[in-house]
Amino acid sequence: MKAAVYDVEGAPGVLKYVDVPDPVAGPDEILISVEAISIEGGDLINRRSTPPPLPSWIVGYAAAGTVVAVGSKVRNRRVGDRVTAFSMQGSHAERWAVPEERNWLIPDGVDMAEAAAVPISFATAHHCLFTRGMLRNGETVLIQAAAGGVGLAAVQLASQAGATVIAVASGTERISSLHELGADYVVDRAKNNVVGSVRQYTHGTGIDFVIDPVGTMLPASLSALASEGRLVFVGNAGGGNLTVDLWPPMQSNQTLMGVFMGPLFERPGVRTSVDNMLQAVAPGRIRVVIDRIFPLANAAAAHEYAETAKPLGRIVMKP
């Protein structure tokens, strides 16, 4: 099969499109013929900064496709099922073997590109907002990097839950789209100071709850937070030092929580949230925003675009 692999970490150009042996499904796994691959922030970070443990390492967390083989212990999937999946590596390929517990059936009316982008973006946003953040109707929520996959999901879910949503992004098209998806107020970070804008919008009180997938924005996120507010930081898309002074948040009785979704996808609550999000796509209750689709053969260009073009939503590749 063909796959996008790398032998040394670095810029997008380290990715090579080559022939590699087909994977074989283990007893507890299914084998997917991949039809759509969602490029996730973790894929970019791993390729950029994580030495591959083996030669011709296949990066990639998320993809959707059709089941072509099942392991001897698999009971809930059969050949021909349309599924979307999450695993810690291997999605940037024509075929992908994943555990039975880390894939979900795709409902009718949901295409493969949409399905590939749902689990990480929407399960992460849902977990941050409601499981960890305990977001309540009427609260104000600040969403950093709101034009990314997790950010766009969080804007929609928070708005539907009755929160006042303040989104941070840049660019006219992105700002317009965020308003359409439910943001009450959008701070253009290229033109305005985020903390000052938030303080002005909230009449000086600050935000009840912040989702920060950037990492390097943590000082600003904390400064925008109200007394006794909550902040969830999920990842480090900014790639910088996450050191922050914890004395001011302690004095303000604020709560900081970290979320790393990798080990959580087999939990029943997270699995159910992914199923619910997938069911919400076809009726239009949620919108999966895809900026651009590349062929897998152009994986290096797709990664370059994801890192530098300031896309709105996810970048998808197709084998």
Positions of PLM-derived features:
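Glycine-rich beta-strand-centered segment in the early N-terminal region that forms part
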Residues: P21-S38, S49-G90
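NAD(P)H dinucleotide-binding glycine-rich loop of Rossmann-like/cofactor-binding domains
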Residues: I45, R82-A145
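Short glycine-centered segments of the SAM/dcSAM-binding site in methyltransferase folds
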Residues: R82, T140, T164, G229-R230, ...
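Mid-domain Rossmann-like dinucleotide-binding core that forms the NAD(H)/NADP(H) cofactor-binding site
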Residues: A116-V118, F122-K191
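Short amphipathic alpha-helix with an adjacent loop that forms part of the alpha/beta core around
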Residues: N193-G204
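Glycine-rich phosphate-binding loop and adjacent beta-alpha segment
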Residues: M217-R285, P319
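C-terminal hydrophobic helical "lid"/dimerization subdomain
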Residues: P268-P319
